């Protein structure tokens, strides 16, 4: 669907709200990565000495910090310009939150741009809106507005109590927090009559909800849950981690 950071190849045949939503999810995932688990890399690329830079989320789930498209007017709506200029003049948390808000606006504008170009009728537009609204906003993920840890999935065999992982584990439950996190042992999962809390468990990296059988891990600093694959932690690695610090917390403390 996309022909570059700020250009697009329009294909008119058989494009559905689901196609546009898939594009939306890919771009959103890339932006969430930039502002969370890859924030150190993103921070370095936002050099205030450079020209107006934009943060682009790409359909394949990656991101790029680059100059805006040369075309005037651009084929796609453009992200906010010049976020790099504000990097050193704001608290990092506020700076990232501001970018997140602008990114949410951009993601919706791109999605409904496609909807207009593909000739979506009222029902198709409403369907697209409902799908995009089903996910937490980038701002909610970045600012911690999404309750990613207190409502969790059923514990695994590693969970001594056999119930949900606690928000704050006991001091003697070292590996419990990591390894129990998100191994499905009983029925439940993502909606469909299962534990309602599970549908509200959101990964702090990709923003996706919990699904059956996934391994997740919780940061001991910010208490945010992550897919193990999103932060490159396996169950075997988690067994040997006394206190887990997510990439965002690790990078923040390094800069401080």
Swiss-Prot record:
SS bond list: none
Gene Ontology biological process terms, A to Z: chromatin organization; regulation of DNA-templated transcription
Chain positions of site Histone H3K4me3 binding: 210, 216, 220, 225
InterPro entries according to UniProt: Alfin, Alfin_N, PHD_AL_plant, Zinc_finger_PHD-type_CS, Znf_FYVE_PHD, Znf_PHD, Znf_PHD-finger, Znf_RING/FYVE/PHD
Zinc finger (PHD-type): 200-252
Highest taxon of the lineage: Eukaryota
Gene3D superfamilies: Zinc/RING finger domain, C3HC4 (zinc finger) (3.30.40.10)
Subcellular location(s) of the protein: Nucleus
First-listed, main subcellular location of the protein, grouped into a coarse class: nucleus
SMART domains linked: PHD (SM00249)
Keywords of the record: Chromatin regulator, Metal-binding, Nucleus, Transcription, Transcription regulation, Zinc, Zinc-finger
Biased composition (Low complexity): 154-164
Region of interest (Disordered), ranges: 149-195
Gene Ontology molecular function: histone binding; transcription cis-regulatory region binding; transcription coregulator activity; zinc ion binding
Gene Ontology cellular component list: nucleus
Membrane spanning residue stretches: none
Entry's free-text remark on domains: The PHD-type zinc finger mediates the binding to H3K4me3.
Role description: Histone-binding component that specifically recognizes H3 tails trimethylated on 'Lys-4' (H3K4me3), which mark transcription start sites of virtually all active genes.
Family recorded in the similarity comment: Belongs to the Alfin family.
Subunit structure: Interacts with H3K4me3 and to a lesser extent with H3K4me2.
Protein name: PHD finger protein ALFIN-LIKE 4
Natural source organism: Oryza sativa subsp. indica (Rice)
């Amino acid at each position: 669907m996309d022909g570059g950071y700020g250009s697009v190849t329009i294909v008119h045949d058989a494009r559905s709200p689901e196609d546009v939503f898939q594009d939306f999810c890919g771009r959103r995932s890339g932006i969430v990565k930039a502002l969370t688990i890859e924030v150190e890399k993103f921070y370095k690329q936002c050099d205030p000495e450079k020209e107006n830079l934009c943060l682009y989320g790409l359909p394949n789930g990656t991101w790029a910090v680059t100059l805006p498209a040369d075309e005037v007017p651009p084929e796609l709506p453009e992200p906010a310009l010049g976020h790099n200029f504000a990097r050193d003049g704001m608290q990092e948390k506020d700076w990232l939150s501001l970018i997140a808000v602008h990114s949410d606006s951009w993601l919706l504008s791109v999605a409904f741009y496609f909807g207009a170009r593909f000739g979506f009728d009222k029902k198709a537009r409403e369907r697209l809106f409902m799908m995009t609204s089903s996910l937490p906003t980038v701002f909610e993920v970045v600012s911690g507005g999404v309750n990613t840890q207190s409502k969790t999935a059923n514990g695994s065999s590693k969970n001594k109590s056999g119930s949900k992982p606690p928000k704050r584990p006991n001091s003697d439950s070292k590996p419990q927090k990591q390894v129990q996190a998100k191994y499905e042992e009983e029925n439940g999962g993502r909606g469909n009559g299962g534990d309602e809390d599970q549908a509200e468990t959101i990964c702090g990296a990709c923003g996706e909800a919990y699904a059956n059988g996934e391994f997740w891990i919780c940061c001991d600093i910010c208490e945010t849950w992550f897919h193990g694959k999103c932060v490159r932690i396996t169950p075997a690695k988690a067994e040997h981690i006394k206190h887990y610090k997510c990439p965002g917390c690790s990078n923040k403390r390094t800069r401080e």
